[in-house]
């Protein structure tokens, strides 16, 4: 594990934990942990260091762990889905799978004694979960239609895979980047519609031409936390669309690793270092670490409204299509994994892609196969054309599995969306994002309507409620929403949302 530059600030408890023992050290102890059981483990190993392997202790479900994978660009193969389902089916109803807002999968129900086998099975099908938690670079996101979209400017798939391989030592764990001051999100966009939500990443690359050469402008510092929300800002830098992206990513990570605050945990994301130094000094130090002067930013090319990729769309490959399917709040079962793999093999070329909206895309579907695919039973649940509120509903895990969540989110999100759709006609889809706590995993600030879990007082009792954000925009001219209402009890939420949809989004009551 790389050591941070010496500092006089008081280290937070997580930094002390990392100094006591390298997070990656638990790789060599996983068989031992499996044999002694979770109750006998050192709490620091069980509750924190296992996260370096992508294994998460869940206090809400004692003894049942969560695994978070790494899926660059959200691209999976059918054999990988089948392998995951084959492993998880032993847990029956205790197993569930969530698509995340970083094109990733989180698998729930894992028993500690099964983790050695689980990690071996991941490796056997080319998957890894290493460095997917704690102070590491998280899943690297990209356009979910990279290589398929006729309008794309650059196919980012191989670049994103190469960057992940570099930062994780091809999935084995890279100690150069396992001791960051805090987690770090990277995204690379190759299209015109900001499918990656560049503004909410610590580091984002967006397409731009410099003197006729296609490359990327660079954005830094975007993040959500319980105490602050900050959109990414321009670094005023451009790099060509080649290994320079990896070099610059490494340089920025090294600067962050060696200079970022390790004191107050609420002030350790990259933007706090940029605030302390100013963007010009930060750019200069990054340039020195990069080993060359940084070219100034070029004109931006992201000028489209964001697409959600649901429905049938022709690919750049003649006669082939991709089909986006809506997965309600991203929740899957083991049977769903089997079915998605079967559909990908039967109708396409065995590929399934995940989106940041928690949906899936089946690719390479021939024109002649579309009618049969669209008649498949799974598509009655995972619709290519969902109703306008369900279509844009995103939700974090909520209190069912997360100890940070203040409210239940997923089932409530589905129920309220369906109820309002039965009562209202909407002229366009409205994106509603739910997050169970201020950590904002559900990204409420990018939604038309964002709902953040809170405990509120009603009739003298503390009940589940939300704060409401309005005005988030994605795609061209993206910006974050602002908190507009606080302390709304969840039982009052349907009426409040109904009024918002009528007053702000042109909804009209249906006549019955």
From Swiss-Prot:
<dbReference type="InterPro" id="IPR051329">
    <property type="entry name" value="NIR_SIR_4Fe-4S"/>
</dbReference>
<dbReference type="GO" id="GO:0048307">
    <property type="term" value="F:ferredoxin-nitrite reductase activity"/>
</dbReference>
<feature type="binding site" description="axial binding residue">
    <location>
        <position position="441"/>
    </location>
    <ligand>
        <name>siroheme</name>
    </ligand>
</feature>
<dbReference type="GO" id="GO:0051539">
    <property type="term" value="F:4 iron, 4 sulfur cluster binding"/>
</dbReference>
<keyword id="KW-0534">Nitrate assimilation</keyword>
<dbReference type="GO" id="GO:0046872">
    <property type="term" value="F:metal ion binding"/>
</dbReference>
<dbReference type="InterPro" id="IPR045854">
    <property type="entry name" value="NO2/SO3_Rdtase_4Fe4S_sf"/>
</dbReference>
<keyword id="KW-0349">Heme</keyword>
<dbReference type="InterPro" id="IPR036136">
    <property type="entry name" value="Nit/Sulf_reduc_fer-like_dom_sf"/>
</dbReference>
<keyword id="KW-0479">Metal-binding</keyword>
<dbReference type="InterPro" id="IPR006067">
    <property type="entry name" value="NO2/SO3_Rdtase_4Fe4S_dom"/>
</dbReference>
<dbReference type="InterPro" id="IPR005117">
    <property type="entry name" value="NiRdtase/SiRdtase_haem-b_fer"/>
</dbReference>
<keyword id="KW-0813">Transport</keyword>
<comment type="similarity">
    <text>Belongs to the nitrite and sulfite reductase 4Fe-4S domain family.</text>
</comment>
<dbReference type="GO" id="GO:0042128">
    <property type="term" value="P:nitrate assimilation"/>
</dbReference>
<keyword id="KW-0004">4Fe-4S</keyword>
<dbReference type="Pfam" id="PF01077">
    <property type="entry name" value="NIR_SIR"/>
</dbReference>
<feature type="binding site">
    <location>
        <position position="402"/>
    </location>
    <ligand>
        <name>[4Fe-4S] cluster</name>
    </ligand>
</feature>
<keyword id="KW-0249">Electron transport</keyword>
<feature type="binding site">
    <location>
        <position position="396"/>
    </location>
    <ligand>
        <name>[4Fe-4S] cluster</name>
    </ligand>
</feature>
<keyword id="KW-0560">Oxidoreductase</keyword>
<dbReference type="InterPro" id="IPR006066">
    <property type="entry name" value="NO2/SO3_Rdtase_FeS/sirohaem_BS"/>
</dbReference>
<feature type="binding site">
    <location>
        <position position="441"/>
    </location>
    <ligand>
        <name>[4Fe-4S] cluster</name>
    </ligand>
</feature>
<keyword id="KW-0408">Iron</keyword>
<dbReference type="InterPro" id="IPR012798">
    <property type="entry name" value="Cbl_synth_CobG-like"/>
</dbReference>
<feature type="binding site">
    <location>
        <position position="437"/>
    </location>
    <ligand>
        <name>[4Fe-4S] cluster</name>
    </ligand>
</feature>
<protein>
    <recommendedName>
        <fullName>Ferredoxin--nitrite reductase</fullName>
        <ecNumber>1.7.7.1</ecNumber>
    </recommendedName>
</protein>
<dbReference type="GO" id="GO:0020037">
    <property type="term" value="F:heme binding"/>
</dbReference>
<keyword id="KW-0411">Iron-sulfur</keyword>
<dbReference type="Pfam" id="PF03460">
    <property type="entry name" value="NIR_SIR_ferr"/>
</dbReference>
């Amino acid at each position: 594990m790389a050591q941070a530059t010496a500092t006089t600030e008081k280290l937070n408890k997580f930094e002390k934990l990392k100094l006591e023992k390298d997070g990656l050290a638990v790789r060599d102890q996983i068989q031992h942990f499996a044999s002694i059981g979770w109750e006998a483990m050192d709490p620091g190993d069980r509750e924190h260091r296992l996260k370096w392997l992508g294994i998460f202790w869940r206090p809400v479900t004692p003894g049942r762990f969560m695994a978070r994978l790494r899926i660059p660009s959200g691209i999976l193969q059918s054999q990988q889905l089948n392998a995951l389902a084959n492993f998880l089916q032993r847990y029956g109803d205790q197993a569930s799978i969530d698509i995340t807002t970083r094109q990733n999968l989180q698998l729930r129900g894992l028993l500690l004694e099964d983790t050695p086998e689980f990690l071996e099975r991941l490796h056997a099908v080319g998957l890894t979960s290493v460095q997917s938690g704690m102070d590491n670079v998280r899943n690297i996101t990209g356009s979910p239609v990279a290589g398929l979209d006729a309008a794309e400017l650059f196919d980012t798939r191989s670049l994103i895979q190469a960057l992940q391989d570099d930062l994780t030592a091809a999935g084995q764990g890279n100690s150069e980047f396992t001791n960051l001051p805090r987690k770090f999100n990277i995204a690379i966009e190759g299209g015109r519609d900001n499918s990656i939500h560049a503004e909410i990443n610590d580091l984002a690359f967006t397409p731009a031409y410099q003197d006729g050469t296609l490359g990327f402008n660079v954005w830094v510092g975007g993040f959500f936390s319980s105490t602050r929300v900050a959109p990414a800002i321009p670094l005023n830098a451009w790099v060509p669309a080649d290994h320079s992206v990896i070099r610059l990513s490494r340089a920025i990570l090294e600067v962050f690793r060696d200079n970022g605050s390790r004191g107050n945990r609420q002030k350790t994301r990259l933007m706090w270092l940029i605030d302390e130094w100013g963007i010009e000094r930060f750019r200069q130090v990054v340039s020195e670490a990069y080993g060359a002067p940084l070219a100034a930013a070029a004109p931006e090319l992201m000028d489209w409204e964001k697409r959600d990729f649901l429905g049938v769309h022709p690919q750049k490959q003649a006669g082939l299509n991709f089909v986006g399917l809506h997965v309600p709040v991203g929740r899957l079962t083991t049977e769903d994994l089997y079915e998605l793999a079967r559909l990908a093999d039967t109708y396409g070329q065995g590929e399934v892609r995940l989106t940041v909206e928690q949906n899936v895309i089946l690719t390479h579907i021939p024109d002649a196969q579309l009618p049969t695919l669209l008649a498949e039973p799974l598509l009655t649940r995972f619709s290519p054309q969902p109703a306008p509120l369900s279509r844009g509903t995103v939700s974090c895990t909520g209190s069912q599995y997360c100890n940070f969540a203040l409210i239940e989110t997923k089932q409530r999100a589905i129920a309220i969306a369906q109820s309002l759709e039965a009562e209202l006609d909407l002229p366009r889809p409205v994106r509603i994002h739910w997050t169970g706590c201020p950590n904002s995993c559900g990204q409420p600030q990018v939604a038309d309507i964002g709902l953040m879990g809170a405990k509120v007082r009603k009739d003298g009792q503390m009940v589940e409620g939300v704060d409401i954000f309005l005005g988030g925009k994605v795609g061209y001219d993206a910006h974050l929403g602002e908190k507009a209402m606080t302390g709304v009890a969840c039982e009052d939420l349907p009426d409040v949302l109904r009024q918002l949809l009528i007053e702000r989004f042109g909804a009209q009551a249906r006549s019955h």
